[in-house]
A protein has these predicted regions:
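Hydrophobic core positions of the immunoglobulin-like beta-sandwich fold
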Residues: 70, 186-187
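An acidic-aromatic loop/edge-strand motif
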Residues: 1-15, 38, 52-62, 67-142, ...
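Solvent-exposed beta-strand/loop surfaces of large extracellular or lumenal domains
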Residues: 44-67, 167-184
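Aromatic-lined ligand-binding clefts that engage carbohydrates, nucleic acids, or primary amines
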Residues: 22-46, 80, 143-170, 197-201
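Soluble catalytic regions of membrane-associated enzymes that act on cell-envelope
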Residues: 17-21, 49
Length: 253
């Protein structure tokens, strides 16, 4: 882990290089980026080619700067080398590869960039190719319904594992679900016949930023030491679920 490298690098007096491996099954399109902090302090090469220094904006936070990886990744193993000059104040932070793709893993240790699924199970999107995802995912489902005369109905979420669910029914915003009871009134937007519900699920930054390697998994309190607790370290990445166990339309007579 990077935190174990930081102290030796700070004590070092010359140049240093760190090598990272990225496994790719399907090269992402159209755009893919490498994200790093303080890029001006380093030089980066990808598969032996110098990474262009053109700034492509920020991601998540203004300190997270994007550099284009277009044309540099290939199927199989890719090598990213981060080089710099050691000094007592240097910081080493995680690197991120971002784009429109899915991530496959068998053991939560090794990960492979692959195609993004278009059909998923909502119970846990972490296991559907989105282990490090942070943001909003839109899930859509159509169904047939014979609407009762009262028109009263609600959408109820079972086992919610999200921060916010923004619910849309036939193109109309029915409201946001953020706490118990995890339900929203949708009757006024339903029609006889085919209905389409879209749920925009929002999660936190936990699966993206961690801590990923604490043996206790999800911690009740997180501080700087939570990311470098050697006594409770595990090489297996620890994620929290993202999704919901089920969603039911309940018609009230």
């Amino acid at each position: 882990p990077l935190w174990k490298v930081l102290d030796p690098v700070r004590r070092h007096s010359g140049r240093f290089s760190l090598q990272f491996s990225v496994s790719v099954e399907i090269v992402p399109e159209p755009d893919v980026f490498l994200v790093l902090e303080t890029p001006e302090a380093f030089s980066v090469s990808v598969n032996g080619t110098e990474l262009p220094e053109t700034d492509c904006g920020f991601w998540v936070d203004t300190s997270f700067r994007k550099r284009s990886l277009n044309g540099l990744l290939r199927t199989g193993e890719n090598t990213i080398v981060l080089s710099g000059t050691a000094n007592p104040k240097i910081e080493l932070e995680s690197l991120y590869v971002i784009g429109d793709f899915g991530v496959r893993t068998e053991d939560n240790r090794a990960f492979v960039i692959t195609s993004r699924k278009s059909v998923v199970l909502a119970q846990n999107l972490v296991e559907e190719g989105f282990p490090f995802f942070a943001g909003t995912i839109s899930l859509t489902q159509s169904f047939e319904m014979n609407l009762s005369a009262s028109g009263q109905a609600k959408l109820v979420f079972d086992d919610p594992q999200f921060v916010v669910a923004d619910v849309w029914v036939n193109g109309n915003n029915a409201g946001q679900v953020v706490w118990s009871p995890y339900e929203v009134e949708i009757g006024r937007f339903l029609v006889d016949g085919t209905n389409t519900i879209r749920v925009d699920l929002v999660n936190s930054l936990r699966n993206l930023l961690g801590p990923h390697h604490h043996a206790f998994g999800e911690l009740l309190g997180v501080g700087p030491d939570s990311f470098s607790d050697a006594e409770n370290w595990t090489d297996v990445y620890q994620f929290v679920p993202f999704g919901f166990g089920g969603a039911r339309v309940i018609v009230e007579s």
